[in-house]
């Protein structure tokens, strides 16, 4: 997955973009009887139960997403959470931390692709509550097998190879469950980078609906 993340960074000037890493984050001023209060835009949207994954999946972004999921569950365990994804993917381990938390908490997590959901980004997109997984019409979704490198003694390389194969089998099995596709087809379709349009992603079972307006939600 690192290979595609590097390509994504090159297409964006060599830098990764996350909500916490932007040079400028808009502020929202709210007025009440107690006076004015300023929020950064992402904190304000968190109050509306919106979470964003923007840029590569790594330990830092996973930690932020997991913390927000747990916080929103504690605020209201019966109200849906909306998870907006625009990500080229990244670390399988970090992504699985997000995935497991999505399944662990009580609220339904609705997912929406805005731009790109590739690799682990696509995996998390498909992990939303069935019937509540969406994409915008010009988004792109890409699935592929996990990748990684190893160095050291032959025994060390063998251990890493077994781990990658185990991860591939685990990811394929979960993706098959979430899409309704046979695991054998998942294995074939993820052999190389497999890009899909929004409509193709619906047909494949990665998402449930293409949204063109807010009224459709």
Curated annotation (Swiss-Prot):
Root EC class: hydrolase
Main localization of the protein described in the UniProt heading: cytoplasm
InterPro entries recorded: ClpP, ClpP/crotonase-like_dom_sf, ClpP/TepA, ClpP_His_AS
GO cellular component terms given for this protein: cytoplasm; endopeptidase Clp complex
The reaction(s) this protein catalyses: Hydrolysis of proteins to small peptides in the presence of ATP and magnesium. alpha-casein is the usual test substrate. In the absence of ATP, only oligopeptides shorter than five residues are hydrolyzed (such as succinyl-Leu-Tyr-|-NHMec, and Leu-Tyr-Leu-|-Tyr-Trp, in which cleavage of the -Tyr-|-Leu- and -Tyr-|-Trp bonds also occurs)
Active-site residues, Swiss-Prot/TrEMBL: 119, 144
A biological-process GO annotation: protein quality control for misfolded or incompletely synthesized proteins
Keywords per UniProt: Cytoplasm, Hydrolase, Protease, Serine protease
Molecular function in Gene Ontology: ATP-dependent peptidase activity; ATPase binding; serine-type endopeptidase activity
Family: Belongs to the peptidase S14 family.
Quaternary structure and partners: Fourteen ClpP subunits assemble into 2 heptameric rings which stack back to back to give a disk-like structure with a central cavity, resembling the structure of eukaryotic proteasomes.
Function of the protein: Cleaves peptides in various proteins in a process that requires ATP hydrolysis. Has a chymotrypsin-like activity. Plays a major role in the degradation of misfolded proteins.
Protein name listed in UniProt: ATP-dependent Clp protease proteolytic subunit
Lineage, uppermost ranks: Bacteria, Pseudomonadati, Pseudomonadota, Betaproteobacteria, Burkholderiales
The encoding gene: clpP
